[in-house]
Amino acid sequence: MKDEHIAVLMGGFSSERSVSLSSGTACADVLEAQGYRVSRVDVDGHIASVLEQLQPDIAFNALHGPFGEDGRIQGVLEYLKIPYTHSGVMASALAMDKGRAKIVVASVGVSIAPSCVMSRFAVGKEHPMEPPYVIKPVCEGSSLGVIIVKENESVPSLNVVGSEWVYADTVIVEKYIPGRELTCAVMGNKALDVCEILPEKHFQFYDYDSKYKSGGSLHVCPAQLSSNIYQNVQRMSLAAHQAIGCRGVSRSDFRFDEETGELVWLEINTQPGMTPTSLFPDIAKASGRTYGDIVQWMVEDASCMR
């Protein structure tokens, strides 16, 4: 039995709760198998008092979505002086805001798609840019709320303004880039292998279901790309990780249009999924690391003041 007591934070109350429970359970299982004393914590509004009672040596952050990866839980852990995994307060908050993250990443020479941040009600009145374009909640993950507006389509007013929209009122609208979906993980200060995502044909893109349903997508890792494009994806992933100030692990998503040669950075994820169908474990495996290796590395990398 190892000496450290690890609290695995999971669940929470974001729309990605089920994903977080899956990630957290898998990580907790591995940590227990490695001999750590593990407390599985389903995060709620009393998390500070729960952690004060548990007095863990390390908090393993397996939360996803608002509160879990936007700087708030990180602030609680800093206040309680509990070392934790993944990025710190500032980087988490910045990465979660897709609009601001794009500005920072573009400032270090990373190619991004033209975009604008606006109210969802304004999008519902007229096209904010010439279609095709993509509408996303500015602070959500797992492709939740993503709408693709194709050429010659009308304004998607019911989807964005209607009562079925359950996300925040601010959205980011960006030019739709056709082509291949690529992603690259960073671990510490090293870019790992590039992975291509091939959603099953009945999925329009790599959405929530294709991410988490068994057989929803195929992960080709390493991706079959020219050495120039492959290295550019790695370079931009590391540049984004460093510009935003990420710590631990991150994963950047890209679109590559083979016809034009355009390679565009889309967004960064500071809390990559660790579910059985997640990308990050597959990327790490291609680099010669087991699931247990990466979980162990995250624990050893944990600290405050990240």
UniProtKB/Swiss-Prot annotation:
One of its GO terms (cellular component) is cytoplasm. InterPro entries: ATP-grasp (IPR011761), ATP_grasp_subdomain_1 (IPR013815), D-Ala_lig_Van_CS (IPR000291), D_ala_D_ala (IPR005905), Dala_Dala_lig_C (IPR011095), Dala_Dala_lig_N (IPR011127), PreATP-grasp_dom_sf (IPR016185). Its main location: cytoplasm. ATP binds at residues 128-183. SUPFAM superfamilies: Glutathione synthetase ATP-binding domain-like, PreATP-grasp domain. Its cofactor is Mg(2+); Mn(2+). GO terms for molecular function: ATP binding; D-alanine-D-alanine ligase activity; metal ion binding. It comes from the Bacteria. Mg(2+) 1 binds at D253, E267. Binds 2 magnesium or manganese ions per subunit. The keyword Nucleotide-binding applies. Pathway: Cell wall biogenesis; peptidoglycan biosynthesis. Residues 102-300 form the ATP-grasp domain. PROSITE patterns: ATP_GRASP, DALA_DALA_LIGASE_1, DALA_DALA_LIGASE_2. Belongs to the D-alanine--D-alanine ligase family. Cell wall formation. PANTHER family: D-ALANINE--D-ALANINE LIGASE, D-ALANINE--D-ALANINE LIGASE B. This is D-alanine--D-alanine ligase. It comes from Bartonella henselae (strain ATCC 49882 / DSM 28221 / CCUG 30454 / Houston 1) (Rochalimaea henselae).
